Amino acid sequence: PIYNITQAVIDLLIENSFQYDSSLMADDIPYIMKTSAGELYEVPVHWGTDDWPPFAHYAEIDYMMPVRSPSAGLEGFFEEFEAQYEAGGFWMPIWHPFLTGRLARWRRVELWLEQVLEQKDVWFAPLEDIVAHIKTVAANGQYRPRVDDLPYYSRPVHLG
C-alpha cells in the first residue's frame, strides 16, 4: 500500500494468514495490530530509511527532487542505524535496486555493511524471521510488544 493501509486491508491480511505488514510508521519497533479478525504484526518503516527521498527523480510522475550524492544520500540511513544500535532497537532500510542498487551508491553501502558486521552483535534478517523472533521472545516473557486495538475510532472524527 506504499505506506498507506486501511482497516479493510489489515483484516484481509489477517484473514489470508499474513504474519506481518510493513506499511506504517507509528513506531521505531515492531508492534501488534489487533482487530476483530485477529492479530497482525506491523514492522514499521519511515522516510528516514527509505532511499526514495534522496535518490528518486521521476518527471513521469511529477516527482522532481534534487538527486543527492551517494555519501550525502546514505548518511541519514547510517545515522538512523547508529541511534537504533545504541538503543538496542530495530532498523530497516528500504533500498530499491534501481535507486541504491546503482554502483556508486552500493559501493558506499557495501563499505558500511562490512564495518557494521564487524560488530558481531548485529542481526540482519528477513522480516518473517524478525517477526518469528518477536513471537518467540514474547511467548517466553522476555518481551512485550505494544498492541494497538483497531479501529482507533469507531466513527468519523470531527475537528471543529
Spans of features found by a protein language model:
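C-terminal domain-boundary segment and adjacent tail
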Residues: 20, 71-160
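Active-site-adjacent pocket scaffolds in enzyme catalytic domains
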Residues: 1-87, 141-143, 159
